[in-house]
């Protein structure tokens, strides 16, 4: 039996390389998705702080108590401090993105029942001994605060003004011009 011609052999390693590259890409995508989910969940306090501070369209139209607001600020900052510096910009944009999604949901369902659909995120905060419960029985708060709908760039400016200063984190200048709604593509 003759040895096989040389030229057919190099094909094997190439396809393996391609497979490895594909696997790496898939892994990276999965990691980014997981990171994004974590960021979005952890940054709910940041979103609430920005919403609250600027009275942007808010599902819980009640104004938060001062103690709760301070707690949200602390939680938000703790999460921002844990995020590596190169991801902080992404984190702020995730907050902005979440606020924009939140506004869009608000627009779609402006019936009174939307009061309760946004109670969920509050339960996720690690608040200790159940000291805070969303004050659902607060009828006079409904409709008393007229939330404003803001365009994307204004929300982004507000978030960039509020969060880095509040938590004393450094956000690089290019962060202000990062694109919207396209996360994990670069």
UniProtKB/Swiss-Prot annotation:
Keywords tagged on the record: Allergen, Repeat, Seed storage protein, Storage protein
Entries under Gene3D superfamilies matching the protein: Plant lipid-transfer and hydrophobic proteins
GO MF term set: nutrient reservoir activity
Pfam families named in the record: Gliadin (PF13016)
Keyword Repeat in annotation: yes
Keyword Chloroplast: no
Region feature Disordered, mapped onto this chain: 1-20
Post-translational modification comment from the UniProt entry: Substrate of transglutaminase.
UniProt superkingdom: Eukaryota
PANTHER family hit by this protein: ALPHA_BETA-GLIADIN MM1 (PTHR33454:SF7), PROLAMIN PPROL 14P (PTHR33454)
Additional information: The alpha/beta-gliadins can be divided into 5 homology classes. Sequence divergence between the classes is due to single base substitutions and to duplications or deletions within or near direct repeats. There are more than a 100 copies of the gene for alpha/beta-gliadin per haploid genome.
General function of this protein: Gliadin is the major seed storage protein in wheat.
Family: Belongs to the gliadin/glutenin family.
Protein name according to UniProt: Alpha/beta-gliadin clone PTO-A10
Source organism (scientific name): Triticum aestivum (Wheat)
């Amino acid at each position: 039996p003759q040895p096989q011609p040389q030229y057919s052999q190099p094909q094997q390693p190439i396809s393996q390389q391609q497979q490895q590259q594909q696997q790496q890409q898939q892994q990276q995508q999965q990691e980014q998705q997981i990171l994004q989910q974590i960021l979005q969940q952890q940054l709910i306090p940041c979103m609430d702080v920005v919403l609250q501070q600027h009275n942007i369209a808010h599902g819980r139209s009640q104004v938060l108590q001062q103690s709760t607001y301070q707690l949200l600020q602390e939680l938000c900052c703790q999460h921002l401090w844990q995020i590596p510096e190169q991801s902080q910009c992404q984190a702020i944009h995730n907050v902005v993105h979440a606020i924009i999604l939140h506004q869009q949901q608000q627009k779609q369902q402006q019936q009174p029942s939307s009061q309760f659909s946004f109670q969920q995120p509050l339960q996720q905060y690690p608040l200790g001994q159940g000291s805070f419960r969303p004050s659902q029985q607060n009828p006079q708060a409904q409709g008393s605060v007229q939330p404003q709908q803001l365009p994307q760039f204004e929300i982004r400016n507000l978030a960039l003004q509020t969060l880095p200063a509040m938590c004393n984190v450094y956000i690089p200048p290019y962060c202000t011009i990062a694109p919207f709604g396209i996360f994990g593509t670069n």
